[in-house]
Amino acid sequence: MNYIGAHVSSSGGLEKAVFRAFQIKATTFSFFTKNQRQWISLPLQKKNIEDFKKACIKYNFSPEKILPHSSYLINLGHPIDFFLEKSRVAFIDEIVRCDQLGLRFLNFHPGSHLNKISEVTCLSRISESINIALEKTKNVVAVIENTAGQGTNIGYRFEHLYEIIKKIDDKSRIGVCIDTCHLFASGYDLRTKIDYESTFNKFFDLIEMKYLKGFHLNDSKKQFNSRVDRHENLGLGEIGKSVFKWIIKNKNFHNIPMILETINPKLWEKEIDWLRSLQ
């Protein structure tokens, strides 16, 4: 079975995210567990947690198939110690929130070197940050998202993801989420069956299947290898629709949450219906 959904708003309460996912006929979803534009948020109250869990039961969402996203403020490879520590504290808080909500995963962007340290040093800082967070928390798997390589963001090569994972102490709590727009923008082609197979062969040459915990299914507004992160609705961008058919039909990817972050939410239900029809 494919679990297909979108990144929905949690405005008005976390339980509202569950209902919004239900409205678009999703079987999974992504959301922010706190205001992603703020470093510090009030702790989750008992009622917040209970309302969210009740909504998941009511609308038939399995907590281990939900893929929440961390704040974009967090930079686990920050070159300045003050901001690195701030990011680490915020990351730990987000993992704790996921655990309180009964969720298994936390998806996050690895970080950026800001042209102040080398990529190698940045990757080491990211691994160290994850190790610190995992040591201070429990249960939740930290899921690294590949990036488009825009600006000074790290994580745009499979080798980057491999190097991060290699240094993680508790490998049962680390995973990867593949964003198709980011793949395409960072130089991994997906437009033909040969290119799609070549890209995923390169991925699995470095990273075992067991680490793949999620997909972000997005077309790209920008051209191949642009290193620019601009999502587009499926089939309306530079990638085209074919790759999404191949991903959905790949039995190795069944039971993995697949999240739309396409730019027009009004099309999400239609996109979910189309993806589901391919199963």
Curated annotation (Swiss-Prot):
InterPro entries cross-referenced by the UniProt entry: AP_endonuc_2, AP_endonuc_F2_Zn_BS, Xyl_isomerase-like_sf, Xyl_isomerase-like_TIM-brl
EC number: 3.1.21.2
Keywords annotated in UniProt: DNA damage, DNA repair, Endonuclease, Hydrolase, Metal-binding, Nuclease, Zinc
Residues the record lists as binding Zn(2+) 1: 69, 109, 145
Binding site for Zn(2+) 2: 145, 179, 216, 261
Cofactor(s) required, per the database record: Zn(2+)
Catalyzed reactions: Endonucleolytic cleavage to 5'-phosphooligonucleotide end-products
GO biological process: base-excision repair
Domain of life: Bacteria
Entry binding sites for Zn(2+) 3: 182, 229, 231
UniProt remark on cofactor binding: Binds 3 Zn(2+) ions.
Function: Endonuclease IV plays a role in DNA repair. It cleaves phosphodiester bonds at apurinic or apyrimidinic (AP) sites, generating a 3'-hydroxyl group and a 5'-terminal sugar phosphate.
Protein family (similarity comment): Belongs to the AP endonuclease 2 family.
Protein name stated in the entry: Probable endonuclease 4
Organism, scientific name: Buchnera aphidicola subsp. Schizaphis graminum (strain Sg)
Taxonomic path: Bacteria, Pseudomonadati, Pseudomonadota, Gammaproteobacteria, Enterobacterales
